[in-house]
Amino acid sequence: MSSTFSFDVVSKLDMQEFDNALNQAKKELQQRYDLKNTNSSIEFNQKDMQLTLESADEFSLKSVVDIIESKMIKRGISIKSLDFGKVEPASQKSVRQKISLKEGIDKENAKKITNAVKDMKLKVQASVQGEEVRISGKSKDELQTVMSALKEMDLPVPLQFTNYR
């Protein structure tokens, strides 16, 4: 019986954990003494998957970004899923920064993953399926080797492995 095994390489954001991290960041923002009179705020547009940060100056905006990053790391969310926009001036001498959330593996990174799998010279196949990459092969050991190699790759998107069969 020659059965094949496979797994999917995906880049998904756990929205529940992200929401928890965001709520913790908002709570800390209200309690921090150094950010008291800076009118700093964090707003999340769920439809556009975009964070909007506002603060009195760039220094306090950097502190808000640090708060968000630390809360995300504590909740186990990779900060690679954040795409930082430029810091732009807003009303009344304040500054604003938009941060987009990235989900899914784009074609360029999917191609890098498939090429890396082919360069390993293992008996596995990689195929791009929309925003995920399916790796299949006859040996579970080879699939685990591919998994560990992909974890060590430095890609601009966080990777998760699902549908291991």
Swiss-Prot record:
Molecular-function annotations in GO? nucleotide binding
Q: Does Nucleus count among this protein's keywords?
A: no
Q: Write the record's keywords in alphabetical order, separated by commas.
A: Nucleotide-binding
Q: Which Gene3D superfamilies match?
A: 3.30.70.860, YajQ-like, domain 2
UniProt keyword Nucleotide-binding present: yes
Cellular component (GO) terms are:
cytosol
Q: Which InterPro entries match?
A: DUF520, UPF0234-like_C, UPF0234_N, YajQ-like_sf
> Pfam families annotated for this entry?
DUF520
Q: Which NCBIfam families match?
A: PRK05412.1 (NF003819)
Q: What does the UniProt function comment say about this protein?
A: Nucleotide-binding protein.
Q: Which family does it belong to?
A: Belongs to the YajQ family.
Q: What is this protein called?
A: Nucleotide-binding protein Ctha_0558
Task: Tell me the organism.
Answer: Chloroherpeton thalassium (strain ATCC 35110 / GB-78)
